């Protein structure tokens, strides 16, 4: 049976106190909407529909980046969850499979949970996702009779016995498309808020003799985000889970609580991560690497045995081959560092390639930007770049070539050549004492007025 996703992303998120739509606030460097879409993507959906409302164009633009094949529809008035799903009807015209309804502000539901919901749909007409709440608070209660879901009772309407139930409603559901929209046509808004509730489908389905069941998942998967405090708590949940997974696969985190990971961070076994390291999106670290304290990595690839930091920054496009060294206060951007090369101190390497076993001296700068365009620097294998060298791109330094300390290299250096490009030193005997005496006299005269 084919599957479609309907992701509700229309809420304004008033408590976020933000100009940004709630679903576009980020957890682990990805919008909450992307987390929901990634989980749903594991079902290989035939269609994906995002229901937008507040700042719909921002949601539309973000959706196009995350999943260009998805359709965005508009809920012009916020008239409840049932009304929101109805806005997806035209986008699902002709679809006869199962529809899974997700929430863009509930980012942690797992692919495994969604797969279990689809499996349960083969046995029931309507499937609701529930969870055992540690503190049921004011959640709606799922009233079960064996495997059958009898009804959903909102907290305010629940009896004392029903409030004692800890199996609660997450809001997520799965249902055949024709059945779902047929039931939604019957949902009314005769309630205090004048809204159309998706949860009314349970009662309507049972009234038509349809079977309804519930699938359970861990409470953490149903965490909804409504405020900045919720967002911070969700970030902490994600980070704790991601760190635990790394520890389980054989990565050493010397101070786990200080390491910040992105949603897509990949780190191989036997890699050591020291304290206060930040991983932005798009980072892969192979096995046996060392990432030292206070380093920041994003959009880069670190190969086996490489050493990074402390206080290093790897920006998008940085590619470190095996056994490379990138040391303290070094920044690498859009550059390939070949096997065994060393860039150990106080250096910027941008839009460049560094050959195998080459040594880059402290203070080296690739001058890659002319104010309008970026240019590349090519450094060959087994070269030696002297400290405080400025490489003015575009420029090439050949294999086994050298640059003298303090050189400003504006011309290509051939294989094996030594390039010296600095002003010749001149010493003036006794001039320093005379100069200092003159300066002190000026200072004294100024002090006297």
From Swiss-Prot:
InterPro entries cross-referenced by the UniProt entry: Bifunctional_GlmU, GlmU-like, GlmU_C_LbH, Hexapep, MobA-like_NTP_Trfase, Nucleotide-diphossugar_trans, Trimer_LpxA-like_sf
Binding locations of acetyl-CoA: 362, 368-369, 387, 405, 422
Pathway: Nucleotide-sugar biosynthesis; UDP-N-acetyl-alpha-D-glucosamine biosynthesis; N-acetyl-alpha-D-glucosamine 1-phosphate from alpha-D-glucosamine 6-phosphate (route II): step 2/2; Nucleotide-sugar biosynthesis; UDP-N-acetyl-alpha-D-glucosamine biosynthesis; UDP-N-acetyl-alpha-D-glucosamine from N-acetyl-alpha-D-glucosamine 1-phosphate: step 1/1; Bacterial outer membrane biogenesis; LPS lipid A biosynthesis
Keyword DNA-binding listed: no
Catalyses which reaction(s): alpha-D-glucosamine 1-phosphate + acetyl-CoA = N-acetyl-alpha-D-glucosamine 1-phosphate + CoA + H(+); N-acetyl-alpha-D-glucosamine 1-phosphate + UTP + H(+) = UDP-N-acetyl-alpha-D-glucosamine + diphosphate
GO biological process terms on file: cell morphogenesis; cell wall organization; lipid A biosynthetic process; peptidoglycan biosynthetic process; regulation of cell shape; UDP-N-acetylglucosamine biosynthetic process
Positions annotated as active site in the UniProt record: 345
Location of region: N-acetyltransferase: 250-449
Entry's localization field: Cytoplasm
Pfam family for this entry, one: Hexapep
EC number: 2.7.7.23, 2.3.1.157
Membrane-traversing stretches: none
Keywords from the UniProt entry: Acyltransferase, Cell shape, Cell wall biogenesis/degradation, Cytoplasm, Magnesium, Metal-binding, Multifunctional enzyme, Nucleotidyltransferase, Peptidoglycan synthesis, Repeat, Transferase
Molecular function GO terms recorded: glucosamine-1-phosphate N-acetyltransferase activity; magnesium ion binding; UDP-N-acetylglucosamine diphosphorylase activity
Cellular component terms (Gene Ontology): cytoplasm; membrane
Cofactor(s), by name: Mg(2+)
Family as reported in the entry's similarity comment: In the N-terminal section; belongs to the N-acetylglucosamine-1-phosphate uridyltransferase family. In the C-terminal section; belongs to the transferase hexapeptide repeat family.
Record-linked PANTHER family: BIFUNCTIONAL PROTEIN GLMU, NUCLEOTIDYL TRANSFERASE
The protein, known as: Bifunctional protein GlmU
Lineage, highest ranks first: Bacteria, Pseudomonadati, Pseudomonadota, Alphaproteobacteria, Rhodobacterales
